[in-house]
Amino acid sequence: MSRAASVAATLPGAMPHPIEVEGLTKRFGKFVANDAVSFSVRPGETYGLLGPNGAGKTTLIRMLTTLLPPTSGSARIDGHDVVSERSAVRRAIGTVSQAQTTDENLTVRENLSVQGKMYGLSGRLLRDRIGQRLRQVGLWERRNQLTRHLSGGMRRRLEIARGVLHAPRILFLDEPTTGLDPQSRRAIWDMFGELRADAPLLSIILTTHAMEEADFLCGRVAIMDQGRILCEDSPDALKRALATGERVELETDRPIVQEDRLAIAEEGAANLRFASPTRVQFEARPGESTGRRVARLLEGAGYHIVHLSIALVTLEDVFFAHTGRALRDT
């Protein structure tokens, strides 16, 4: 939890939740894209929606940003209803979508100037705000460059600068680092820290299918699948709730037969999964040496262990525990 969110949490009634969602549902014919989704976001909090493509994350964001009317349920953004007070909601929010929204035939500065004027900024205030945001995202030196000449990572940074140019109280980030290389992705993550320092009470909703991104950026995370929120808490609390602390992966030189699979389960391996005929994954409590016991069991049965790794539980393990499948496989 961020410092601002921590302070807000100790002052009940002093700072209402800027985002409140209750039973929000969206149907397209017989298909239910979002099914009675409920949650709230505190002032200064970064709240993550983690799930695979098709989980309903983007549909939910489109409803919260007034681009799509809900079938039922309600949502209030900065105290305003997303259906009956759409103009007020739009004034309070900033958005960064998956798609590129900047004009590639304008310069970096011109793109921000157009955005600022749409929100009523002008004159010195607009010039100062453009300079501030471009420095924050590391694009000041490229302010006069045509947008079409920017790299993918730079374009994403420009999109984020546009989203926060008018100093919104709430920011929606829909898959902000999709398609970026690891170095560009980490640069975006670091940039969020700088933006957060400048606006400690800014509330952020971040959608992502990258568990590392949710773990790094979010104070709380909701695991989404098939239009529903399955669980919600801080990343650390979600991982602790598995009652396990280590993720074990083991690979043998030949397929593991059913009899030996049952023997592995009897060794206390939690959330047991056979990723392939020769590769087994499971979770275990720290210090119990379950991984090494399973390795010895298989070696005693005549298998040769070609790979054994033991790591900490991740949010992907949380997703698997709630859905029975891996996040990367969806």
Positions of predicted regions on the chain:
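Conserved catalytic motifs of ABC-family nucleotide-binding domains
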Residues: 167
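Conserved ABC ATPase signature
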Residues: 105, 146-153
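Catalytic Walker B motif of ABC-type/P-loop ATPase nucleotide-binding domains
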Residues: 171-174
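Conserved ABC ATPase "signature" region
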Residues: 113, 117, 124-142
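ABC transporter nucleotide-binding domain
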Residues: 191-285
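Conserved ABC transporter NBD signature motif
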Residues: 73-81, 89
